[in-house]
Amino acid sequence: MKKVLNKYSRRLTEDKSQGASQAMLYGTGMNDADMHKPQIGIGSVWYEGNTCNMHLNQLAQFVKDSVEKENLKGMRFNTIGVSDGISMGTDGMSYSLQSRDLIADSIETVMSAHWYDGLISIPGCDKNMPGCMMALGRLNRPGFVIYGGTIQAGVMRGKPIDIVTAFQSYGACLSGQITEQERQETIKKACPGAGACGGMYTANTMACAIEALGMSLPFSSSTPATSVEKVQECDKAGETIKNLLELDIKPRDIMTRKAFENAMVLITVMGGSTNAVLHLLAMASSVDVDLSIDDFQEIANKTPVLADFKPSGKYVMADLHAIGGTPAVMKMLLKAGMLHGDCLTVTGKTLAENLENVADLPEDNTIIHKLDNPIKKTGHLQILKGNVAPEGSVAKITGKEGEVFEGVANVFDSEEEMVAAVEEGKVKKGDVIVIRYEGPKGGPGMPEMLKPTSLIMGAGLGQDVALITDGRFSGGSHGFIVGHIAPEAYEGGMIALLENGDKITIDAINNVINVDLSDQEIAQRKSKWRAPKQKASRGTLKKYIKTVSSASTGCVTDLD
């Protein structure tokens, strides 16, 4: 008996009572034969206003052509996106994290309303990646991700530069390290064309995580956006989705607990973004896999950082592509027993089978260190708890900035206040900068603090101050930084009670973050604290404030 591949779409195309549905489909140009083909949603996060996403419609057309060669019907649709790079440092960043859940909601909506049989998602920028994955997990229909790809490095006066060079140029100009003319030249040359920000920032981090999970084709995460190989990846989309339909392999068959462990190992080795903690928690929630922030610490305790990527290192993702790509790194880890090779992937094969014929990394490469010569012996993503963060926080400690910082609090109730203080020279060596009321509800949307960290680095204070926040950090942030502090200030967390001059200890060796205050003093301050007025009174941010969970559970919006 022939297997039914259009088990969802036939509800509309083969049911005589659905004449209006069929009339509209005929009106789109479908013919009698098309009515019996499986329908594949091709969900692109295309929009013109961002290098990460500007080319995705073109990739979507390549995917549609590939799908239709396999006697399937491709149905392209779009969802929304937010450019973190463009909105960074403004109130627009409040819309970034919530766009992740809007992307998941909108893809789920289109797929479910139109009864598509499978989904190929094409994300480009940071929150696109987990948003698409959360939709795939919720729907649990055959599908996978094609990453839009990484940007090539910019070049200025013979040296490679990227988006973080542009962010740091303002602080460098303020401190006299570069001229205004050099700043202008930097921002004009940092982004040479299509593709996501080139270092191990959030988009590339999540692309690596998705490939390690088995939810994208091999090499997807490291293939540059404008390369021939990215077009070839799109050309494989049709046979890949058809194979998934025929074998009835669904996301929940692939996105298992062991697959998430593979993802956590790879992003640690790669020196990935703190945002991966939030996003992997949310992705796991979408498929009912039990994952907690403590699991990230367990992985960090036994996994080294090996990749010398920007922002704290030298290289960008396109450099890795040139020496074998992400699969070459995973093959090294598999040989070392650090990955679960028996995990199923969207190729229909196991991870080990996918990696069997992948070439090893070149012996003399300087991008990925050998296991016996790590950049850091344990993971850079450290989960810190203590009286400042009883529910946890996430520190990004590469080792270059040290592992323990003791200093006095310099407290700001917004990102803007802190930026003004740096401009006025009011941030000093030894400060623990506190930026609060920037959490999931308080921000709202937990905006990223890349502008403050870039100012700190640009001003030459990277080794001399620490920054803690209930907001997030961009993958481009580096320095002694701790984010995702929970409970957040808006909900009366300890970070709301900190005052200028408080002595704070951040210890990434013992995984603690504490303020030197007695329980009596903390209780006294708590009794005087009053919740601030919500920053959003209507619209999408108002809804987000009402539904978003704590950073310690991934900031999801569909929990009970």
From Swiss-Prot:
The modification N6-carboxylysine is found at K127. It is an enzyme of class 4 (lyase). Pathway: Amino-acid biosynthesis; L-isoleucine biosynthesis; L-isoleucine from 2-oxobutanoate: step 3/4; Amino-acid biosynthesis; L-valine biosynthesis; L-valine from pyruvate: step 3/4. PROSITE patterns: ILVD_EDD_1 (PS00886), ILVD_EDD_2 (PS00887). [2Fe-2S] cluster binds at C52, C125, C197. InterPro entries: DHAD_IlvD/Edd, Dihydro-acid_dehy_C, DihydroxyA_deHydtase, DiOHA_6PGluconate_deHydtase_CS, ILV_EDD_C, ILV_EDD_N, IlvD/EDD_N. GO terms for biological process: isoleucine biosynthetic process; L-valine biosynthetic process. The active site is at S474. One of its GO terms (molecular function) is 2 iron, 2 sulfur cluster binding. The keyword Amino-acid biosynthesis applies. Its EC number is 4.2.1.9. It catalyses: (2R)-2,3-dihydroxy-3-methylbutanoate = 3-methyl-2-oxobutanoate + H2O; (2R,3R)-2,3-dihydroxy-3-methylpentanoate = (S)-3-methyl-2-oxopentanoate + H2O. It comes from the Bacteria. Signal peptide: none annotated. Its cofactor is [2Fe-2S] cluster; Mg(2+). Mg(2+) binds at D84, D126, K127, E448. Keywords: 2Fe-2S, Amino-acid biosynthesis, Branched-chain amino acid biosynthesis, Iron, Iron-sulfur, Lyase, Magnesium, Metal-binding. Binds 1 [2Fe-2S] cluster per subunit. This cluster acts as a Lewis acid cofactor. Functions in the biosynthesis of branched-chain amino acids. Catalyzes the dehydration of (2R,3R)-2,3-dihydroxy-3-methylpentanoate (2,3-dihydroxy-3-methylvalerate) into 2-oxo-3-methylpentanoate (2-oxo-3-methylvalerate) and of (2R)-2,3-dihydroxy-3-methylbutanoate (2,3-dihydroxyisovalerate) into 2-oxo-3-methylbutanoate (2-oxoisovalerate), the penultimate precursor to L-isoleucine and L-valine, respectively. Belongs to the IlvD/Edd family. This is Dihydroxy-acid dehydratase. It comes from Francisella tularensis subsp. novicida (strain U112).
